[in-house]
Amino acid sequence: MELKVLNIQGAETGEVVTLNDDIFAVEVSEHAMYLDVKAILANRRQGTHKTKTRAEVRGGGKKPYRQKGTGNARQGSSRSPIMVGGGTIFGPQPRSYEQKVNRKVKQLARRSALSSKAAAGQIVVVEDFSLESIKTRPVADMLKNLGLAEKKTLLMMPHYDNVVSTSGRNIEKLNIQVADQASTYDILNSQAVLFQKAALQKIEETLG
């Protein structure tokens, strides 16, 4: 698949890049993408949820009332799970939600995600650019010129650029990632994937 390279004004530069079929034209594996995205979202969870059992709730050492003669069911503690203010039975406890995905499955998932975007015509290539100072306006103008201002856009960069990353941080629908660090979730959660030209080479080195 060939794509025209655009400049930040949205005009064609006359240059054409060829997408690697081993990355952008593979048979899409929905199961691999499912496994990877599920693991990514699970691994984001803190797992710090906690409720107290009857052993952990403060108080309740004294028997609420005598064993016999009241007509009520016998009770040994006011912190019993059936009492108001009592402990919780089988409540959530701190745990790890970490899920492991094999490296080959992760790579297949990323290739599948990129291939699905390529098939849908949702990949755009722009010439390499940099900013002299931190300003949101140039990045916002570039997205507008490319017709991506209203779309959830993933900008793939060849390397980390603090000026560009900080400039685009305040744009709600823009996600900026270094090409070899963008996850399957980042790709699938976007409506358009915007590659700097050099980022294509970076992704080929990673997934090729």
Swiss-Prot record:
Region described as Disordered: 46-97
Pfam families assigned to the protein according to its UniProt record, in alphabetical order: Ribosomal_L4 (PF00573)
Gene Ontology terms: biological process: translation
Keyword vocabulary terms for this entry: Ribonucleoprotein, Ribosomal protein, RNA-binding, rRNA-binding
Biased amino acid composition, Polar residues: 69-80
Keyword Ribonucleoprotein: yes
UniProt protein name: Large ribosomal subunit protein uL4
Functional description taken from the UniProt entry: One of the primary rRNA binding proteins, this protein initially binds near the 5'-end of the 23S rRNA. It is important during the early stages of 50S assembly. It makes multiple contacts with different domains of the 23S rRNA in the assembled 50S subunit and ribosome. Forms part of the polypeptide exit tunnel.
Highest taxon in the source lineage: Bacteria
GO cellular component: ribonucleoprotein complex; ribosome
Family membership noted in the UniProt record: Belongs to the universal ribosomal protein uL4 family.
Keyword DNA-binding: no
Subunit structure: Part of the 50S ribosomal subunit.
Molecular-function GO terms, alphabetical: rRNA binding; structural constituent of ribosome
HAMAP family: Ribosomal_uL4_B (MF_01328_B)
Taxonomic source organism: Chlorobaculum parvum (strain DSM 263 / NCIMB 8327)
Gene3D superfamilies: 3.40.1370.10
